[in-house]
Design a protein with these regions (language model features):
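Extended, charge-biased low-complexity segments
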Residues: 1-79, 86-141
Length: 141
């Protein structure tokens, strides 16, 4: 595995804590790793992790996008984590049942923030089989 970059000490500690917790559930696959990494980027998503994701059930909470603690940046973090978790493109349960996709999941909307370099890290965690070659090439230059 490649060396993971963290935005700050709190992000690193959050990731380690959640990873250790997931080991107890035997849930340390790429889906979980990417999700806990991404939700650890922003202080709001770290502090409200249990409102966003239920580790016991392995379920995201789409309605967390509408919580008052969300900021535009934490919404981007949440959307990318949701999309990489299960290809979610919805902003509510109602949208899901009506098959109404949200344009807020488009890369042009998600990546236009200071977290973009860390979003790439989350993608590398989720898709190591596709990003390993690029990582190896960059390291050999």
């Amino acid at each position: 595995m490649f060396k993971i970059k963290f935005i700050d000490k709190e992000h690193r500690e959050f990731f380690k804590e959640k990873y250790n917790s997931l080991q107890g559930y035997r849930k340390t696959d790429v889906y979980y790793l990417s999700l806990i990494y991404l939700l650890g980027i922003d202080e709001n998503t770290r502090n409200n992790f249990n409102k966003i994701f239920d580790i016991d059930k392995g379920e995201i909470n789409i309605e967390a996008l509408h919580c008052p603690w969300q900021t535009s940046s934490s919404e981007k973090v949440t959307r990318l984590a949701f999309n990489l978790w299960n290809s979610c493109n919805y902003d509510s349960r109602e949208d899901y049942f009506n098959d109404k996709y949200s344009s807020e999941y488009n890369p042009s909307n998600i990546f236009c923030c200071s977290y973009a370099p860390y979003f790439y890290e989350g993608i590398k965690l989720r898709f190591p089989e596709y990003t390993r070659t690029l990582q190896n090439e960059l390291e050999n230059e």
